[in-house]
């Protein structure tokens, strides 16, 4: 039986569960969401990471897909809405662990991404596109900051 985690969040909250989201500094990481195995569907809410990560030259992942080493472990992220923001460098706002990238799938169908264009970024190499087919991102301003909003293509 396939297990799926659905996250329904109303209003603005910070994911701060030290046991799940913070790793000792030597390992880096300061994620709002860390996925090791399974499917995560995000329908809304505010997801934030602060600027104290030591990964990727100080970038701060908000969502980190880190598929476990087991052959059967796969990570799937489906984003339908929400706001995703970091206090640090947003180059890897959504990021897959390099060693297990082939076992990770990201499909974005909605949301606002501050400082990060999910349709054209460098998280997994030049011109990475996390958008699901039939969706577009357009540049907007969110709280005075450059951001991209993902919507269904017209």
Where are the predicted features?
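Surface-exposed loop/turn motifs in large extracellular/passenger domains
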Residues: 1-88, 95-116, 124-153
């Amino acid at each position: 039986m396939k297990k799926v985690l659905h996250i329904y969040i109303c209003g603005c909250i910070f994911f701060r569960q030290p046991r799940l989201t913070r790793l000792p500094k030597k390992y880096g990481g300061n994620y709002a969401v860390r996925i090791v195995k399974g499917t995560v569907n995000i329908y809304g809410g505010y997801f934030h990471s602060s600027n104290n990560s030591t990964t990727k030259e100080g970038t701060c992942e908000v969502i980190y897909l880190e598929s476990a080493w087991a052959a059967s472990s796969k990570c799937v992220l489906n984003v339908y809405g929400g706001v995703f923001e970091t206090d640090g460098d947003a180059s890897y706002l959504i990021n897959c662990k390099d060693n297990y990238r082939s076992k990770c799938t990201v499909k974005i169908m909605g949301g606002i991404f501050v400082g990060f264009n999910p349709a054209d970024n460098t998280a997994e190499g030049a011109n990475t596109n996390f958008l699901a087919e039939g969706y577009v991102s357009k540049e907007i301003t969110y709280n005075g900051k450059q951001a991209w909003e993902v919507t269904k293509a017209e």
